[in-house]
Amino acid sequence: MKRFKKLVSVLTLTAMLAASLTACGGKDPVAEDDSTAGTTTADSSTATTENSGDSTFTYAISGDPTETVNVITTSDRWGLSTVKMIYSPLYMNNADGINWFLATDYSVSDDNLTYTFKLRDDVKWSDGEPFTADDVVFTYEAMEQEDNLGWAYSQLVYDQGTVKVEKVDDYTVSFTFPFVTPTAIEMLSQIFIMPEHIYKDVTDFEHNDYNMNSVGTGPYKLVDYQSGSYLKFEANENYYKGEPSVKNIVFQIIENADTAILALQNGEVDAYQMTPQQVKKLDLDASNLTAYSYTEGRVGYLQFNCNRVTDENVRKALLFAMDRKAMDDAAFESDEYYSIPYTFLPTNSQFYTEDGVEKYEQDVDKAKSMLEEAGVSGLKLKLGYISSDAVQSAQALLIQEQLQEVGVTVELAGGDGTAIANAMKDPDNEYDMYLGGYIMGIDPDTFSSLFENDGAYNYMHYSGYDTIDQLFEEGRSEMDESARKETYAKLQAAVQDTGAFYPIISNNKILVVNNRIQGVEDAGLVPVYTFEDTSSLKIAE
């Protein structure tokens, strides 16, 4: 009998691929992690722990955060996981509400422009120096400098002006927006605070003497980093929530999935993220393991390049030819590991609705009829996807089969993730459609960079859908939540009516953990970072 626990995520995330200036501050998607099927085996030497002793938790990760890890520019999964070990944000804006860290409360001015936060007065940096509002002002102002390439730049700098950050007193800080917005709490969240007394003279946040000798307010201190091998952390005795009971945590870098799984089964590592297919092959009880499933608020999708597939009715016909549930079952075994979204929002969003939305449920006869009406026959399409991603590879094969049923030939053009992403940016790229996925923020406005006609990440390259832009504008300027829900219901329907975007899956992450590690539920499994607060982890006595 396999041991399996299902958790509800307490966070829907915010990380960025790059800094970009947009008119309304939509967030950018977190970089996809396509390394689970990697074939390169990293140096398997450990931080002389190999699960040695009861005081170490070893987590196998599939990528190297590198020595450039820092609060300002880091935006990849394992880099952000490292940042969260060392530093703390004011708060995290979760699907279930705010989870406070360095701040304790906030108030809003009568004109809805200024947000004032009270800070904890009992926090020390890991070097013993006191944490104050000066550190908060320093961090946010550094994030607002375009030359710093901060991942949160577009959350704080707008065409209308820059968010003004001011110290009220040592433990109070205010943020004044240049316009009224219901997304302010979202835009200010998830930004980790760095110490002014350490970084005040730094001009290059990626290359300096402090990143690998970091001083933070998080639960752990980074004490050793070996490129391509491991990162070792020690408990921060000054942590404001109390010194963590797990004294050492090691991020063991193992790029090859088979190597990592074998290490997990042998007790050499304590945790590893796995796919449903990988979990299915394990005897969890025999290996003393538990699998935890949790949502990341991720949406996997198919997009059309509208510069190549220009006819909206042809795009819709192709969507009616597809069966997303067959794709999902092929990749994730059963709906225990996923839900099906029918709009651009993840299903756990409070704004998600299927009312008035065209779902494009498979109807082969309708697809054939629509193609015939459009005068299309012998259509050939090129599908771009990440070839090392097992899920996308399975989806691509089924799309090829399903479209063949309506007389459409699909060329599978799998490639490197970075190369595919770079090609998608080019409006004149050679792909007719592409598979992808994103993790965005809580608020629907954070998706604007993906779906507005001139959005920085609108790789569908459509134009003329003015209603979409208008509805995004209405949503971001409306403070009443019920009115916003009505607006975003219309917006979800409008995006699906383009026939350019086909949401396929909102899949769970699976973390498999050795049963000697306790407190996983208390630590909270969340998107990207894995744990909301590693200080809650414990090791069985």
Model-assigned labels for residue ranges:
Residues 282-283, 309-348, 394, 495-503:
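Periplasmic-binding protein-like
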Residues 107, 111, 154-199:
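Surface-exposed binding/hinge segments that line
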Residues 320, 336-373, 389-392:
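Structural transition elements
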Residues 60-110, 141, 215:
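N-terminal lobe/hinge region of extracytoplasmic solute-binding protein
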Residues 511-541:
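Long beta-strand-rich cores associated with HINT superfamily self-processing modules
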Residues 236-282:
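Ligand-site clamp/hinge motif
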Residues 77, 96, 189-243, 248, ...:
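Gly/Pro-rich hinge or "lid" segments in bacterial periplasmic/extracellular proteins
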Residues 411-420, 447-515, 540-541:
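Extracytoplasmic/peripheral linker and loop segments enriched in polar/acidic and small residues
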